[in-house]
Amino acid sequence: MATLLNGKELSEELKQKMKIEVDELKEKGLTPHLTVILVGDNPASKSYVKGKEKACAVTGISSNLIELPENISQDELLQIIDEQNNDDSVHGILVQLPLPDQMDEQKIIHAISPAKDVDGFHPINVGKMMTGEDTFIPCTPYGILTMLRSKDISLEGKHAVIIGRSNIVGKPIGLLLLQENATVTYTHSRTKNLQEITKQADILIVAIGRAHAINADYIKEDAVVIDVGINRKDDGKLTGDVDFESAEQKASYITPVPRGVGPMTITMLLKNTIKAAKGLNDVER
């Protein structure tokens, strides 16, 4: 039976440590501030944004939400981002994805100042991450790595298999694991013999957005299984990309859904916001 990697518990511990750090910064006259921009009325996006606001409040990070109509023009959104870039009281800027169809997502991401890009999506920060330089790491991969480290799970020489190749999770977590001296294999929708490959994984990371796509048949005995998927069942409950009940019989460690990777993603956003505030104000990190 697998040991749970409980992201909810770990995130609460980390937030308490961050609160102490934020209080110390406030004593120096610096309050980290995050601006979240939400375009449209996507219920899932609204829920995520609420979670971010709540987490900011717990740690003492200041935050504000700019809510914009679905039909706002791209130029208007770019103007708002520019204003936030030039506001010295704002340290982190997050544009909640996905954006409406009339928006060029890449152009919007590129418009955020790299120094305030707390999502870690700007190409300058992605490039720095790739070369191992100090930068903002995308929040979900950062959360996964933090969870693995919290249990002293050795990555060196281990075979990590990633199912999914998105810019938000799949690609960056592979780079981070490579920097930890893991051997990394990417798999995706065009991969042949997927099961054959995943059964070689010491660490299996699943990020495909399809409920229960992976079960115990895909998992090597005693593998570490990280389930990034968040899917809503017919009864409204959340479930992951991994069939938890079968997988936990085979894995050594496994993340649940919910209370796994999700809470860690928000917590790493807070960590990046504190980092941004320090960097913009020349405070020692």
UniProtKB/Swiss-Prot annotation:
It catalyses: (6R)-5,10-methylene-5,6,7,8-tetrahydrofolate + NADP(+) = (6R)-5,10-methenyltetrahydrofolate + NADPH; (6R)-5,10-methenyltetrahydrofolate + H2O = (6R)-10-formyltetrahydrofolate + H(+). GO terms for molecular function: methenyltetrahydrofolate cyclohydrolase activity; methylenetetrahydrofolate dehydrogenase (NADP+) activity. One of its GO terms (cellular component) is cytosol. Pathway: One-carbon metabolism; tetrahydrofolate interconversion. Its EC number is 1.5.1.5, 3.5.4.9. The keyword Transcription does not apply. NADP(+) binds at G164, R165, S166, S189, I230. Keywords: Amino-acid biosynthesis, Histidine biosynthesis, Hydrolase, Methionine biosynthesis, Multifunctional enzyme, NADP, One-carbon metabolism, Oxidoreductase, Purine biosynthesis. The keyword Oxidoreductase applies. Coiled coil: none annotated. GO terms for biological process: L-histidine biosynthetic process; methionine biosynthetic process; purine nucleotide biosynthetic process; tetrahydrofolate interconversion. It holds the Pfam family THF_DHG_CYH. Disulfide bonds: none annotated. Belongs to the tetrahydrofolate dehydrogenase/cyclohydrolase family. Homodimer. Catalyzes the oxidation of 5,10-methylenetetrahydrofolate to 5,10-methenyltetrahydrofolate and then the hydrolysis of 5,10-methenyltetrahydrofolate to 10-formyltetrahydrofolate. This is Bifunctional protein FolD. The gene is folD.
